[in-house]
Amino acid sequence: MAGGRFSPALRITRGEGLGRRIPCRRIVTLVGSRPGCKINLQHPAVAPVHLALVHTGSRWLACDLATLRGTRHNDLPLRVDEVLDGSVLTLGPWEFRVEIAPPDAEAPEAEIDLDASPGDPTLEHLGTRRLFQPARDVCLIGRRSGCDIAIEDEEVSRVHAILFKHHDRAVIADVLASVPLRINGEPRRFAHLHQDDVIEVGRTQFRVRFPRGVHAATPGGNGIAAPSATSEATAAKESDLVDIRAAEGKHWPVADRLERLRKDSMPSGS
């Protein structure tokens, strides 16, 4: 929805908590059975981190996090899709209707960045130098084979992080991974990406590359920087969590195992 501010919510239309309306104001709203998810659903059919609702700055995207049981959007299997007012999301015994209020006429207009897009990042695997170019609006990084970038590393969660664009800037968010995502050696839940940043997912490292002449965090052409998000985008506050208990693309595997990489890098005869 262009211009203005709008507040999305999920309303439970089937399952425990029927009729409840849950505001989703975060850049990344997580739904799953793991503590820390904004919407905590306790049921065997719900994965620990099952669904991400992602705000790009102009659209809301729903992304199934490579789950075994899956998620349905308007009764069709979901991978990544834009959700609109009235969209229906189904996972386990729950059904949610997306409610997106029209822009508030009193609210200030969103800032418009008149500079060219910083472009899509390419990730360079620092072990193999292999390049990965995300092709989806939300790129999944993790251990599960259904991830866009699948990493064979026991320290990597099934889905560890998601890569997407927020206000046309490349960002990455940790999705409650057991080993924290690191950017340039620092644990981060959410970060804007810059040229030559090093992303650490478990013991696997990627260097961020942007097209030549492009910078990922320059001020907008109107002299106002594009809105910046903080780690609060994914940090869960106890009072902000909703706990509900039930009554009852393209895939680029990181081919070389880390052990093989370590052996290849050892000097001959060692």
What are these model-derived regions, one by one?
Residues I22-L91, Q133-R203:
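Forkhead-associated
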